[in-house]
Amino acid sequence: MAFIGNKFGLVSCVVAIVLCSCSNKEHGPDGFSYPVAPPSEVVSFFDTYLPASESSSLSDMIFNFPDLDYQSNEYMLVNSRKEFRDLLTVEVPLPDIDFKKYSLIIGKCTLGDPGYVLDEQAVHTEGDHMKLQLQYRRLDGFFPCVVTDFYFWGLYQKLPDLPLEVDLDII
């Protein structure tokens, strides 16, 4: 059991580092919006209820994610506290997010094994819709062929309420 906790902690730290490393480039010259550095309360909430990957489906019990087919994606743009609350299936204390200034993107994708890590995410507004770019990196080593759910989230400067698509890249 200690191994699972250590693995969970390591994955959570990696996700937090990736999210925070993007904080210096909230709006890049390339037209992309990058996640902002989230307050520790927000990081703690997602470390607890939406770890980067897990096999116990705790996140599916707390968040309203549908069952996905292999290599499918589910994602939500959250622009209000009510929308955030509506995503949850149980009553848990929500972190304080100023939805007048920020938008939250929460999602889930399913990959063929646990050997991936989210390296970068960014949103690009393209006319009447937005595209969320997710870049996963293949880790070195051997991983069992076990379909694995990967969860992601990002806090952004306020985004328009437009349809959102996901572009998943694996490097």
Predicted features along the sequence, with ranges:
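A short, surface-exposed interaction/processing loop segment used at functional sites
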Residues: P38-P39, V147, Y151-W153, K158-L159
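A short amphipathic beta-strand at an alpha->beta junction
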Residues: Y156-I171
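An anionic, turn-rich surface loop/hairpin at beta-sheet edges
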Residues: Q135-W153
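Sec-dependent bacterial lipoprotein signal peptides
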Residues: M1-C20
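Post-signal-peptide N-terminal segment of Sec-exported extracytoplasmic proteins
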Residues: F46-R85
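Mature extracytoplasmic domains of secretory-pathway proteins
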Residues: D69-K131
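Bacterial Sec-dependent N-terminal signal peptides
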Residues: L19-Y49, I171
